[in-house]
């Protein structure tokens, strides 16, 4: 039973598989080992990955990215509202449950998709990439999420996997996966326990995890982070800087022009990467807006100044995990960098300064480490007996405190943050007033004292409590956190033995089973449409290839001398006629293209066969150029 590991990233995704006693990171159909987390819609087809990102400047409002910044969040969330200012695509609210929906034009119709559906399309692409490489279907996967993802975001990611027809064996934390990659790489090189800090700064999220690694046992001691900090935020600072510069130089504001903004953002992303290895980067965009060319440059020092507060925000979570573990900086044996944004020199400098100049560990590929670790975990969960991984033990923690609201709106923690998971914790509560017949259990996650400042996960009632003075009934509340970090809560009246429970996936914004079932059906329908479109284009290309193959044949000197003028005229007339039809009917159906090939072959083949029967030359065929098909 093959299982794959998928790093579902904000900007790029990556897939790996355990094969022949090692992890293989699988290249996509473009030969790239990471795939843009982009989905595009147009009048004829849906594009995913490189194909979607490559056309974004031409079709910005129907090209969706950053689904990870929407998944599991409410439309009214201030983070979502802020992000919407930077996105060219339209995000609307589902009025019933404050859930964000992405609106696009697809095949002439207005369609809406949930963030889970967009993420499922990216997951499907990664699944297909693995299946193409392995040559067999893949149904099982381990998917990674930021360590600081809350319960709703984890469940929504699991739902995305379900929509893409994957059995999600486990949701694991990204820095934990990276630690597996590091630990496996170093297995046997160091004896005894080592303390490793994983610093994971990606395209959209930031995590820090502190682990103890000892002879194949990986124990997460503490984790912290920011689910909304990464390379995209640095890009935003550059975009705003150059928008202001363009306005200052040319007295024109490009903020309202999505195509110009997208071209500028692509140039900013390129400049940011250049600044990791050079002290200055050029930005050159022809005819950016109103026919005006925009040629400018930026220094690394200016970039660092623009992003200084964001870079400094990376340090606080590091200090937090050290404090949570009651460890000083000298106790850390290795600082491992993960995520593309850790290539930024200023980020490396700040970490190094914090640890008094300690050398940073750059031994693992920052773009692939998370998928690598996920692939190892997938192999373990699938029962792989390889001696390299069979004895690995992984112990993770709950990233946020979990508790209930008690009198006065106070947060009473039942599972403190950094508790080892899976776990079950129980506390006993009682009634607040005499003869109280029911209690409302409101479940929250977060670190603030008052529940109003934390995140409500769900609520339920336990009723039928027998009349008794306040403080008499014994109500036992149990929190059960599974290996995915997803929570189940049970409340039991010890007198009546009455039990009520809630799986904290019934959160208001979460997809219902009915929603998921429909989305699975839609995904299958889109997959069929994608296949039909692929076959249609192949038939169109086959027809075009055949026409030019025939034209080349009748211009071959060996053939011209053997063909009568009338035969040559017939072939020329038919090929020209078919070519004109093709140019005017680019959107024709597969069967129409195939029929045109048959019609042309029925005229051309009898004529050319006279020549080919006596020669060894190959006849023109519809498959001459199939290797060039996309």
Curated annotation (Swiss-Prot):
Q: Which UniProt keywords apply?
A: ATP-binding, Chaperone, Nucleotide-binding
Coiled-coil ranges per UniProt: none
One GO molecular-function entry: ATP binding
Q: Give the superkingdom in one word.
A: Eukaryota
Please list where the region (Disordered) is annotated: 611-630
Q: Name one GO cellular component term.
A: cytoplasm
Bias (Low complexity) ranges: 615-630
Q: Name one GO biological process term.
A: chaperone cofactor-dependent protein refolding
Chaperone: is it a keyword of this entry? yes
What NCBIfam families has UniProt attached to this entry?
PRK00290.1 (NF001413)
Record's PANTHER family?
HEAT SHOCK PROTEIN 70KDA
Instruction: Tell me which family the UniProt entry assigns to this protein.
Output: Belongs to the heat shock protein 70 family.
Biological role = May function in protein folding and assembly, and disassembly of protein complexes.
- State what protein this is by name: Heat shock cognate 70 kDa protein 3
Q: Source species, please?
A: Dictyostelium discoideum
């Amino acid at each position: 039973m093959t299982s794959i590991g998928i790093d579902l990233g904000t900007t790029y995704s990556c897939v790996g598989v355990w094969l022949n006693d090692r992890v293989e990171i699988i290249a996509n159909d473009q030969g790239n080992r990471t795939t843009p987390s982009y989905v595009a819609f147009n009048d004829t087809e849906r594009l995913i990955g490189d194909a979607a990102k490559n056309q974004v400047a031409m079709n910005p409002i129907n090209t969706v990215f950053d689904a990870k910044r929407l998944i599991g969040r409410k439309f009214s969330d201030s983070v979502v509202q802020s992000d919407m200012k930077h996105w060219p695509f339209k995000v609307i609210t589902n009025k019933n449950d404050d859930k964000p929906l992405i609106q696009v034009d697809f095949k002439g119709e207005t369609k809406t998709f949930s963030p889970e559906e967009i993420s499922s399309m990216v997951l499907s692409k990664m699944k297909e990439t693995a299946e193409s490489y392995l040559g067999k279907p893949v149904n099982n996967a381990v998917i990674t999420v930021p360590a600081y993802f809350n319960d709703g975001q984890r469940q929504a990611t699991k739902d995305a996997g379900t929509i893409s027809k994957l059995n999600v064996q486990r949701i694991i934390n990204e820095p934990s996966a990276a630690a597996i990659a590091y630990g496996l790489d170093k297995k046997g090189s160091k004896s005894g326990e080592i303390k490793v800090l994983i610093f994971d700064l990606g395209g959209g999220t930031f995590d820090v995890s502190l682990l103890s690694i000892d002879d194949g046992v990986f124990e997460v001691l503490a984790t912290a982070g920011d689910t909304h900090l990464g390379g995209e935020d640095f890009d935003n600072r550059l975009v705003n800087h150059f928008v202001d510069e363009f306005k200052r130089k040319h007295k024109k504001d490009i903020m309202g022009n999505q195509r110009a903004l997208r071209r500028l953002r692509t140039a900013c992303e390129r400049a940011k990467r250049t600044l990791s290895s050079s002290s200055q980067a050029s930005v050159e965009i022809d005819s950016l807006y109103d026919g005006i060319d925009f040629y400018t440059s930026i220094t690394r020092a200016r970039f660092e100044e623009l992003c200084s507060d964001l870079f400094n925000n990376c340090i606080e979570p590091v200090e937090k995990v050290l404090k949570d573990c009651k460890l000083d900086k000298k106790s850390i044996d290795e600082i491992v960098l993960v995520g593309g944004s850790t290539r930024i020199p200023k980020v490396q400098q700040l970490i190094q300064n914090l640890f008094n100049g300690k050398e940073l560990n750059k031994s693992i590929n920052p773009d692939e480490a998370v998928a690598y670790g996920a692939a190892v975990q997938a192999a373990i969960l699938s029962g792989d007996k390889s001696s390299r991984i069979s004895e690995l033990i992984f112990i993770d923690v709950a990233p946020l405190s979990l508790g209930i609201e008690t009198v006065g709106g106070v947060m009473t923690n039942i599972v403190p943050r950094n508790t080892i998971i899976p776990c079950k914790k129980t506390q006993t509560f009682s009634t607040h007033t005499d003869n109280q017949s029911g209690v409302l259990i409101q479940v929250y996650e977060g670190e603030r004292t008052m529940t109003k400042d934390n995140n409500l996960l769900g609520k339920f009632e336990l009723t039928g409590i027998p009349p008794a003075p306040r403080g008499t009934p014994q109500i036992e509340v149990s929190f059960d956190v599974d290996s995915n970090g997803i929570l189940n809560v049970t409340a039991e009246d010890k007198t009546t033995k009455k039990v009520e429970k809630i799986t904290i996936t019934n959160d208001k914004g979460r997809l219902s089973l009915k929603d998921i079932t429909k989305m699975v059906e839609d995904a299958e329908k889109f997959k069929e449409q994608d296949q039909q479109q692929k076959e249609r284009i192949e038939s169109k290309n086959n027809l075009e290839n055949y026409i030019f193959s025939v034209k080349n044949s009748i211009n071959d000197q060996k053939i011209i001398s053997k063909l009568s003028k009338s035969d040559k005229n017939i072939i020329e007339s038919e090929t020209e006629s078919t070519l004109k039809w093709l140019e005017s009917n680019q959107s024709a159906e597969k069967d129409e293209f195939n029929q045109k090939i048959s019609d042309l072959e029925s005229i051309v083949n009898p004529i050319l066969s006279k020549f080919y029967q006596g020669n060894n030359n190959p006849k023109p065929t519809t498959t001459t150029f199939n290797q060039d098909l996309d």
